[in-house]
Amino acid sequence: MKRFCIACALILLQTLWGPLDARRFSISTNLLDYARLGTLNMDASYAASRHWSVTAGARYNPFTFREGDPDRQFQYRQQSYALGARWWLWHTWSGWWFAGKARYQEYNAGGLGDRETEEGDRVGAGLYLGYTHMLAPHLNMEFGLGFWGGMSWYTRYSCPACGVVTDQGQEYFVRPDDLMISIVYVF
């Protein structure tokens, strides 16, 4: 009886899950995000059909540079989470794609260019366009760009370390988001 129940459960799982064929999942990392003061990032995707994939991603940057010298300190600290979907013109993991994402970001940025620092939270949605080039059966290179907009709750300071508040509030924003050159592993 136990074997029968296990067999029924496996058949039910395969029926609900769909066919277990190759190239349904991928993980990727955007190489250009590392140039943004060492922002660590990872995306995971699932091919829901031939033309659609769903994606989830995270970015994390805990780094503060020149922390011991308040006059020269700078940072782009953040944690960011996104959920989205892609529509592929040809088929998933190859060719042109369009995407939409919902995103949350907690950030603290400043000290580069001018001394003003801003920290806060952003919530919004974005639109993206890109191209994925197949390098090998399981390895792709991805190029893309996008914009996102939404609501920002912020506090601005006169410098990265002094704590003097110059402004705070909330505002709508539209800004460039991803400039992507990503390595993608498909499995």
Please name every model-derived segment:
Residues M1, T29, G100-A102:
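Generic cytosolic/nucleocytoplasmic N-terminal low-complexity/intrinsically disordered segments
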Residues G18-P70, Y172, L179-F187:
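Short glycine/proline- and aromatic-enriched beta-strand/turn motifs that initiate or cap beta-hairpins
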Residues M1-R24, F187:
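Cleavable N-terminal export/targeting peptides
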Residues R24-I27, R66-D69, G110-G113, C162-Q168:
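Extracytoplasmic loops and strand-loop junctions of Gram-negative outer membrane beta-barrel proteins
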Residues Y46-F143, S182-Y185:
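Gram-negative (and chloroplast) outer-membrane scaffold detector with strong preference
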Residues A136-F187:
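Predominantly the C-terminal beta-signal and adjacent terminal strand-loop region
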